[in-house]
């Protein structure tokens, strides 16, 4: 029976005055609902658009349809078009496998990809699980063996490659041991299903086979069997609203003309020209359960059409969807757009909470949309997790650097503080000390050895400064002083000094150069702080005075004056010209510090006794015999040796100056006479010229008047200097070895107080028990107290033994007072049950 277009239109929109079907193309104009149908049943479509025809260009081409499961609470008259089966296939893999057409199409796709065995194996496992127990074990066993041989035994097959080794091993054991269980293939089936859901199933939805099937509308019989045709020509009602062309009014009779003019292709095919007109208004966002790998759909949404997923017209990406949902959650945004509501888009109060809950769920689902990865702008540092050993080594090195910096800063502050204290002490001592007028110095000697500007300098003009360890002169002085302190080369009168007292600058602590010498007669002793490197002119002045009185101790005044005049008048300021005494073989004599040449204090080494005792008769002539000057080659060689020794001492002085105490005060030095000259006492007066002598190889100018009759000193022997340096290095090595031995002995004494680790295996358990016991000696009785389970056991302990090839044995210990053996700083035992 054929129906007219008007009758079809009436059937299509039965009673527009009372209610509206979901397929209504436009909402009616308010107030004109009753004028939609005439008395003869003819529909006047112009009333739908009479008031809005001018605004169609700016409005969407389709209206928001009403679904029966929206928040309206009732189902409108009429029914929605059924969802085609091929669209349900996109919901989940189970939806695809529940349809015969879907299985056939999916198998075709898998054959093209050469992995159809995965689908066959999945169905084989499902059929095996559905086998009833009463079918007999023999039939189940044959079926299990067939599945195992065809799909799992072949390691090159697609199914065998996707199944985990543990699962294959389990199935093999079940088959070989004849333990047939209906669920023995469940794990393998789950793994294959996971593989299909993650790889082959998404590829199938994007494949040309499936997209072509959806474009042609499919040939599934289910689509036609559940609905009857309402038209005489057998055409099916479309599942979606027809396409509405812009700027043209839609009329019901247009559909018949379009159907007649179109090809046999169904009218609900998906076109790429106007995709937005046919896209589902509510796209289902699937949420997959993690336990059974199923999809759950919101009850009020339709599944997404795969055509639009892969055709370039996909919906907004996940980030955009999330932003939209967050905006909806943070405000009462219009998300429904129901134009016929009194309050546009705002749901009633009783539906607001469920609606908000659905929005939250939608936001969570959108966060897992499988779209291309968007790189993060703020990345976690790659080295946030470092190996503990590397981290500890780097941390220790940095902490050691910080510790060295702090120690250097503390030393610098201590040195500055010491200099300030010395300056304050010098001011006090100089102001209260006796004047130079009290010294018994002949005026003639004073005038003879000093110029006008030196004689005018007062005692208060003395400037003392701290010696710097990088200064070559101070390093050389320190080395010479250490050589002179050697026990085998003691000078006469060693009992009157403390040889171990030493300041950080290489000078004897409490010994003040040139200002603490014993005076002749009833004179007192001058006190002053130590000046490591005094100004040359000032130190010359005072040292000469004290030397004169010290050398003249116990002599008549005339004899002392004559000796002083002869000594200081005979300074020969030539390069490496020294005077050796009858027993002179000390390193200091080779370093230009002989008592008759460069040492105005009169101190010398072993063989030089002029400054420490009265000169015996006959010694004078022997000590002052004339010598020939050295040739230029010998002087140059001696200069190189001296410079080499100074550089070596510069490096050694950096590590050997710290452990000694600070400069002693004046009280500590009272009543002590130095038997060895300090560095300033020996070289303080010639520092300004020693460096120039090494650099320029010329005679420096000096304020002293040279005595042409003063004989030059012989050159030092280089072999003697090297032998002395070697002897000093060996002595330092012996001292360091003694300190290391003492440290090791001290550590060995501390070891018995440490704890020891005890580990034991209890009755064959693979994991040992570990504990710690105080002390290094543990007996079997103490070990038994550690056991939580009491009983009759045998005890074996690991020890080193070369009786067997392995090098270790487990020895049984029975006595409670027996000491347990220690193996690699641990006690390792085994506790076995007595049979």
UniProtKB/Swiss-Prot annotation:
Residues 616-627 have a biased composition (Basic and acidic residues). Residues 753-835 form the DIX domain. ADP-ribosylated by tankyrase tnks and tnks2. Poly-ADP-ribosylated protein is recognized by rnf146, followed by ubiquitination at 'Lys-48' and subsequent activation of the Wnt signaling pathway. Ubiquitinated by rnf146 when poly-ADP-ribosylated, leading to its degradation and subsequent activation of the Wnt signaling pathway. The keyword Magnesium does not apply. Residues 92-214 form the RGS domain. CDD domains: Axin_TNKS_binding, RGS_Axin. Its main location: cytoplasm. Residues 437-512 are annotated as: Interaction with beta-catenin. One of its GO terms (molecular function) is identical protein binding. Keywords: ADP-ribosylation, Cell membrane, Cytoplasm, Developmental protein, Membrane, Nucleus, Phosphoprotein, Ubl conjugation, Wnt signaling pathway. PROSITE patterns: DIX, RGS. Residues 328-344 have a biased composition (Low complexity). Residues 351-436 are annotated as: Interaction with GSK3B. Pfam families: AXIN1_TNKS_BD (PF16646), Axin_b-cat_bind (PF08833), DIX (PF00778), RGS (PF00615). GO terms for biological process: cell development; determination of left/right symmetry; dorsal/ventral axis specification; dorsal/ventral pattern formation; embryonic eye morphogenesis; eye development; fin regeneration; forebrain anterior/posterior pattern specification. Residues 16-60, 318-349, 485-530, 602-627 are annotated as: Disordered. Residues 40-53 have a biased composition (Polar residues). Gene3D superfamilies: 1.10.196.10, 2.40.240.130, Regulator of G-protein Signalling 4, domain 2 (1.10.167.10). The keyword Metal-binding does not apply. GO terms for cellular component: beta-catenin destruction complex; cytoplasm; nucleus; plasma membrane. It is found in: Cytoplasm; Nucleus; Membrane; Cell membrane. The DIX domain mediates interaction with dixdc1. Component of the beta-catenin destruction complex required for regulating ctnnb1 levels through phosphorylation and ubiquitination, and modulating Wnt-signaling. Controls dorsoventral patterning via two opposing effects: down-regulates ctnnb1 to inhibit the Wnt signaling pathway and ventralize embryos, but also dorsalizes embryos by activating a Wnt-independent JNK signaling pathway. This is Axin-1. It comes from Danio rerio.
